[in-house]
């Protein structure tokens, strides 16, 4: 068996990744394929946590700009992340991976409350843990959730699984054909250059807690496993190069 580079990871998925080609909603076949990819990594003995965005179902900022109360808009988005978490958990269970959903907002009928010690025990027992409802407070993104939960569970790396984007560039490669991809960056580089991998709160949390980020294209089958076993794909962000 290949020895994985990372023993404990947090995979950050965008909500749009669950929507497939439709771009909105949840495409069950797409989620099932992703579950198979995650299972491949789980079979290597890697401990896995997940944070999934909610942008396929709801976006708080545009709703607030249209006149909705921002706090209510953000809470609505948090519920969207729980919907995504439950669907992913079911798909993982169906491929034979024991999975738990923990939410930052209590909803005992559908998920466990987020309790760090319990999450760690689940990971140590080989269960996947999906963190839903953000951090339970408005104004904080699911990127910040990923960085915070990674620090709390002492993850070795955050895998930023991007939809059709194969790394970090100095400009938008879809708009600028001269854009150059970075293979490696420091967290300080990301912040000083204003590169939008995560929001600034999440980037600072990752830097302060010495957590590696790997940004890669999740649409390429097998890429999650390639990252975990240490193949050079995408862009790696760390404190030390």
Curated annotation (Swiss-Prot):
Q: Where is this region: Involved in allosteric activation by GTP?
A: 20-25
Residues engaged in binding ATP? 12-15, 55, 59, 163, 169, 172
Q: Which reaction does it catalyse?
A: UMP + ATP = UDP + ADP
Q: Which GO terms describe its cellular component?
A: cytoplasm
Residues in the signal sequence? none
Return the broad EC class.
Answer: transferase
Report the subcellular localization. Answer: Cytoplasm
- Which keywords does this Swiss-Prot/TrEMBL entry list? Allosteric enzyme, ATP-binding, Cytoplasm, Kinase, Nucleotide-binding, Pyrimidine biosynthesis, Transferase
Q: How does it assemble?
A: Homohexamer.
Q: Which family does it belong to?
A: Belongs to the UMP kinase family.
Name of the featured protein: Uridylate kinase
- The coding gene here is pyrH
